[in-house]
Amino acid sequence: QGAEINVDDYINFLNEYDEGVEICCQWDTIPVGVEPEVASQQTWDNYWYMRERLKSPEKLLYVFHEGEDYKWLEKALQHDEITYIALGGVAKKPFKIRDKFFETCFEIISKVKPTVKTHAFGMTNRKLLEKYPFTSADSTSWMYPAKFGTIQWGDWKIVNVSERQVESPDHVYN
């Protein structure tokens, strides 16, 4: 985020490690600080630019972001080549916004191309993962508890493991 990376360098990297890559994300433009229509067009153009240059273009995920016009999602779903999409731009958005975004996306998907695979980008909220038929998901939220000396234990329970918090009622030794 915020780093300058060359799209051709990214393509070369993906081609070099193609055998070890199951799926990969396209070079996208998130509509933050950029007009959504401009971001959508850049994302669309970058998808096809990358697809033409990858050893395994079928591994490339098209990315549709919260805040973009849903016509871009519909457009992507109408292409036979696009079999796996990522739904993103929701990482720091409130639950209600994410829920409404996914609800609308999956309504469109069910009408246009119900067989498309979907990836939740930057989102591993359990309620949303159980509510919508995602194929895959990712986020960095699993790392945050460790910053505070806690870990996830079993079925989503957070327990304290910090030596500084031994007296805490949620400490693993208590």
Regions found by a protein language model. Give the residues of each.
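Acidic, divalent-metal-coordinating active-site segment for phosphoryl/phosphodiester hydrolysis
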Residues: 124-133
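Glycine/Thr-rich beta-alpha phosphate-binding loop at enzyme active sites
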Residues: 28-38, 59-125, 141-167
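Short, glycine/charged-enriched secondary-structure capping and boundary segments
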Residues: 133-134, 152
